Amino acid sequence: MTNIRKTHPLMKIVNNAFIDLPTPSNISSWWNFGSLLGICLILQILTGLFLAMHYTSDTTTAFSSVTHICRDVNYGWIIRYMHANGASMFFICLFMHVGRGLYYGSYTFLETWNIGVILLLTTMXTAFMGYVLPWGQMSFWGATVXTNLLSAIPYIGTDLVEWIWGGFSVDKATLTRFFAFHFILPFIIAALAMVHLLFLHETGSNNPTGILSDADKIPFHPYYTIKDILGAMLLILTLMLLVLFSPDLLGDPDNYTPANPLNTPPHIKPEWYFLFAYAILRSIPNKLGGVLALALSILVLMFVPFLHMSKQRSMMFRPISQCVFWTLVADLLALTWIGGQPVEHPYMVIGQLASIMYFLIILVMMPVASTIENNLLKW
């Protein structure tokens, strides 16, 4: 009799995705981040669900309800900090996952890559709206500044901003709709992740060499299930160390002050995972230009597959491209640092240079490095 997991309509899908899936035998730990992102998403949905049971999306009570969760709800403090720091872990995994894709040429799977970029954008929007919910100073001013950017869109800008706000300023209507969107978007992300996986399984996984691995495949279970469990344990260990020892390490002290429209904080800045994009936004003196640069900082990833000039897929055997890639990583770290600094003399110039370098590396230096390598190998 054939095994039920191979015949049952529902089990068959699970079997083909997680058990009998033919997988390259040489994929490294850089391939663990996909499953880690899945775990992060499940964790965020579960902790978020329990937070939503006690949270109130009203401007007068939102801040107090978060305080109530931390003080009065059983284990509310750990749920709240797991959710807040879970977002940080989510973005660490996202950046590693995208970096892996860039390094090993996984972007040549066009559909998978483009859905991945859409997933990144959706996750960023979800995290932004979540940051508004505690209704602290940085929540309020972050929402005001970031939504106001849309007013730079010619002709319809102002109307668009007021439509998003549900009034003439960030107020009760804004908070309520942000809560509604923040609740629904993770489920949309989960659905998109399924499509992401569907397209990936059409082609099979890439591997560190970038060479077709059809001749050397192994079943996903038990080899990669056990590897994913190890990754998950390390992820949860890191998250719990953060939650239990320094839960506010990555947060902003200003968010422990209730939102006050009459008092602007001295330095408005987003959470650490948006600082690189924020630095790019601020580096352009023109409002519309800044907004376009901000959008392009993520959308530029969609151009990467078309700029692939190398005859090899992966960067594993391409030392010049490797140097360019790690320069990009260093540049992103510099942008992250600049995004958290005030708009003053040395920081402004560094931010502008780092922003120019970011686009230059992706759009010019990477294709040039690939072409040089092709010529060196007489290809």
From Swiss-Prot:
InterPro entries per the UniProt record, alphabetical: Cyt_b/b6_C, Cyt_b/b6_C_sf, Cyt_b/b6_N, Cytb/b6-like_sf, Cytochrome_b, Cytochrome_b_C_euk/bac, Cytochrome_b_N_euk/bac, Di-haem_cyt_TM
* Matching Pfam families: Cytochrom_B_C, Cytochrome_B
Q: Name one GO biological process term.
A: mitochondrial electron transport, ubiquinol to cytochrome c
* CC terms in the record's Gene Ontology section: mitochondrial inner membrane; respiratory chain complex III
Cofactor(s) for this UniProt protein: heme b
- Membrane-spanning intervals of the chain: 33-53, 77-98, 113-133, 178-198, 226-246, 288-308, 320-340, 347-367
Subcellular location per the Swiss-Prot or TrEMBL entry: Mitochondrion inner membrane
Cofactor note, please? Binds 2 heme b groups non-covalently.
Q: Which residues bind a ubiquinone?
A: H201
This protein's UniProt keywords: Electron transport, Heme, Iron, Membrane, Metal-binding, Mitochondrion, Mitochondrion inner membrane, Respiratory chain, Transmembrane, Transmembrane helix, Transport, Ubiquinone
Q: Which residues bind heme b b562?
A: H83, H182
Q: Annotated Gene Ontology MF terms?
A: metal ion binding; ubiquinol-cytochrome-c reductase activity
Q: Which domain of life is it from?
A: Eukaryota
Membrane topology per the entry is:
Multi-pass membrane protein
List positions binding heme b b566: H97, H196
Enumerate the PROSITE patterns for this protein. Answer: CYTB_CTER, CYTB_NTER
Q: Which family does it belong to?
A: Belongs to the cytochrome b family.
Biological role stated in the UniProt entry: Component of the ubiquinol-cytochrome c reductase complex (complex III or cytochrome b-c1 complex) that is part of the mitochondrial respiratory chain. The b-c1 complex mediates electron transfer from ubiquinol to cytochrome c. Contributes to the generation of a proton gradient across the mitochondrial membrane that is then used for ATP synthesis.
Assembly and oligomerization: The cytochrome bc1 complex contains 11 subunits: 3 respiratory subunits (MT-CYB, CYC1 and UQCRFS1), 2 core proteins (UQCRC1 and UQCRC2) and 6 low-molecular weight proteins (UQCRH/QCR6, UQCRB/QCR7, UQCRQ/QCR8, UQCR10/QCR9, UQCR11/QCR10 and a cleavage product of UQCRFS1). This cytochrome bc1 complex then forms a dimer.
What's the miscellaneous note? Heme 1 (or BL or b562) is low-potential and absorbs at about 562 nm, and heme 2 (or BH or b566) is high-potential and absorbs at about 566 nm.
The name under which this protein is listed is: Cytochrome b
Which lineage?
Eukaryota, Metazoa, Chordata, Craniata, Vertebrata
